[in-house]
């Protein structure tokens, strides 16, 4: 009798183990089975928000997955990322954010996180940054601008969205190559305001994603782009690499991150979904209409990009803080 009971118990245990083994893959396969919250550290209606909503529309139509896009703008992106860092690491709360928010902001001010506080899921997009001038200014190239700024040190200035951003510190790195030229940095609230100021003659140079120049392509001349290669929309605009230094490369990179310790199978599933969405011809057509360039990388590669960003801007940020502390 006891042998019979033992055999039955052994059989039951084996069946239970088999069911557990089957349940684990099934759980992974069903993720996500409820809406995903995507926290945006930017305002509604701008390029990252548009990108998120285009991706969300694809996921809903193709897979029935709801992407709840929540804007939590302000505070240099800190409140949004702090909220994300405290979320449950189950893959149901993620963020579409920028390398600037993840790597530059934490080095400038205490904020309770670094880029290593998050799980990199996927790089999604790159925005080519450019320097635009008015043709009426007579500025024909970067070298020409620097020569003019040397001769008239109080005449020229460069505007860009945000006071303590990657653009600000890229500008600092660039100006080291032109110590006799004076082109001070002026912060604006956003790309729209900046372009309006340029068109009105209130600023000499605008530094912003070239997508902001495209609606005014005949009115604005792009004299340099900070990507590694020339931009498809402005093929005649040389890069800073061509004109100054091979290390002066900076694209405005956006990607998906989540809290630390999201299970690997869920990270992989999210990567698959976003990769598929960005490869869809319909999604690509919609992104092209709003001048957004898809640029997919898996999480591990996106993490390397974030480290490169952090390392590139560490020196100018340190220089800025030392100078500020000495004042």
What is each stretch, according to the model?
Residues 1-7:
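N-terminal secretory signal peptides that target proteins for export/translocation
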Residues 83-92, 106-193, 240-242, 249, ...:
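Hinge/capping helix and adjacent helix->loop/strand transition within the periplasmic-binding protein
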């Amino acid at each position: 009798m006891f042998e019979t009971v033992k055999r039955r118990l052994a059989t039951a245990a084996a069946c239970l183990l088999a069911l557990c083994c089957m349940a684990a893959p099934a759980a992974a396969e069903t993720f996500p089975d409820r809406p995903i919250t995507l926290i945006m550290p930017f305002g509604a209606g701008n390029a990252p928000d548009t990108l998120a909503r285009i991706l969300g529309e694809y996921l809903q139509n193709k897979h029935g997955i709801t992407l709840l896009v929540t804007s939590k703008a302000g505070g240099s992106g800190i409140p949004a990322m702090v909220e994300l860092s405290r979320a449950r690491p189950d893959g149901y709360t993620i963020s579409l954010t920028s390398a600037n928010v993840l790597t530059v902001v934490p080095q400038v001010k205490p904020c309770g996180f670094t880029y290593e506080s998050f799980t990199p899921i996927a790089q999604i997009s790159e925005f080519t940054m450019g320097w635009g001038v008015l043709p009426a200014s007579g500025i024909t190239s970067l070298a020409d601008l620097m020569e003019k700024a040397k001769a008239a040190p109080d005449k020229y200035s460069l505007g860009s969205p945000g006071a303590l951003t990657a653009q600000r510190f890229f500008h600092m790195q660039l100006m080291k190559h032109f110590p006799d030229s004076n082109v001070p940095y002026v912060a604006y609230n956003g790309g729209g305001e900046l372009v309006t100021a340029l068109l009105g003659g209130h600023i000499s140079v605008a530094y912003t994603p070239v997508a902001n120049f495209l609606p005014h392509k005949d009115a604005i001349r792009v004299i340099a782009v900070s990507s590694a290669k020339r931009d498809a929309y402005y093929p005649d605009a040389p890069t800073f690499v061509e004109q100054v230094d091979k290390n002066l490369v900076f694209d405005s990179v956006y990607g998906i991150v989540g809290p630390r310790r999201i299970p690997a199978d869920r990270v992989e599933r999210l990567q698959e979904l976003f990769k598929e969405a960005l490869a869809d011809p319909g999604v690509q057509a919609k992104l092209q209409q709003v001048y957004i360039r898809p640029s997919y990388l898996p999480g591990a590669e996106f993490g390397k990009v974030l480290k490169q960003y952090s390392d590139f801007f560490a020196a100018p940020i340190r220089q800025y803080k030392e100078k500020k502390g000495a004042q």
